[in-house]
Amino acid sequence: MNEKRLFTEAQTENEAVDFTPKREFHGEMHIEKDEPVIEDRFVEQTFEHIVQPRSRWWKTGLALTALLFCFAVIAQSIQWLVDTWQQNQWIYFVFSLVTCLVVLLGVSSLGKEWLRLVKLKKRLSLQQKSQQILRESAVNLGQDFCAEKHQQIKALCTEMAQMLKLSSEDPGLIQWQNQLHDAYSAQEVAHLFSQTVLHPFDVQIKKLISKSALEAAVIVAVSPLAVIDMFFLSWRNIRLVNQIAQIYGIELGYWSRLRLLKMVLLNLAFAGATEVVQDIGLDWLSQDLTAKLSARAAQGIGVGLLTARLGIKAMEFCRPLAFQAGEKPRLNHIQQELLGQLRSTFFRSNKTKVKQQV
């Protein structure tokens, strides 16, 4: 049996009782939606590892071997030209002259391709350097450190303006220089440069992306042949990337164009469907496309959005300064334009068919 316990009045008064405070509930409660958590850091690190692999010794050796081979071919061509001239072998001299010219043209074209590829790599490294400066200045807020980062980002923005081939009398550049202040942080300097200098380029490219997406959507929705759609979209997408690079002052060659397309397509593959869901939202569920538009129109909308995503990714890589928070273009406005354009196109075609039948 349990033993008897005696309680005194002093013990009960000294014991502290832990009561739960009352909670009041109202009829209306605000529930915040949980944002989807995406492993952006892991995706970004993996993507950068693929796009910019570590330099290997065999690549350096292969480049040196190719360089020595080019010099050997040039030297042999010149030697052949001199020998045929000295020996009065005019037929061989003509052949050697043509060969020498072809070799020189080939080497010069390879040199131009290499320079364009170097400029593209320099543009990407400049963008990454600006990202690093902005990231470091956001973490460390010391006065001396902020002043140092202010000068660094200012020098980078000036170099970006030179890459864009802007003159010293450009209105946007002059406005940016006049609005600068020593008290501004690196983020404020970069944001000011983006809004004054890069804003006209961004607006032009956004219009180009919207136009290309609308054209691709209408062509796919109207065209009956899938083969024609495939070749048309391939040509249009490559042309879109070239136009975006040209607007941002990047001169693309063969290898630099391949490298840029590789980076854009890899980024599209790594981003996946989660980014599309974030950009578009759940508007698709409320619009009931299957009840209003045909399957072909839905295919056109999908192709148009993919074209827009391709243009936005190319814009991210070609833009000298990386997008900050809230500056990156989204697919919402392009989605609305696609829906309106396709709806008007299909409804117009249906009305004409009804009139013809009547």
Curated annotation (Swiss-Prot):
Chief place of localization: membrane
Source domain of life: Bacteria
Record keywords: Cell inner membrane, Cell membrane, Membrane, Transmembrane, Transmembrane helix
Keyword flag Metal-binding: no
UniProt keyword Transmembrane present: yes
InterPro entries noted in UniProt: DUF697, UPF0283
Cellular component aspect of the GO annotation: plasma membrane
Bilayer-spanning residue ranges: 62-82, 90-110, 213-233
Subcellular location: Cell inner membrane
Pfam families noted in UniProt: DUF697
Membrane topology label: Multi-pass membrane protein
Protein family: Belongs to the UPF0283 family.
Cross-referenced PANTHER family: UPF0283 MEMBRANE PROTEIN YCJF
HAMAP family cross-referenced by the UniProt entry: UPF0283
Protein name according to UniProt: UPF0283 membrane protein PM0909
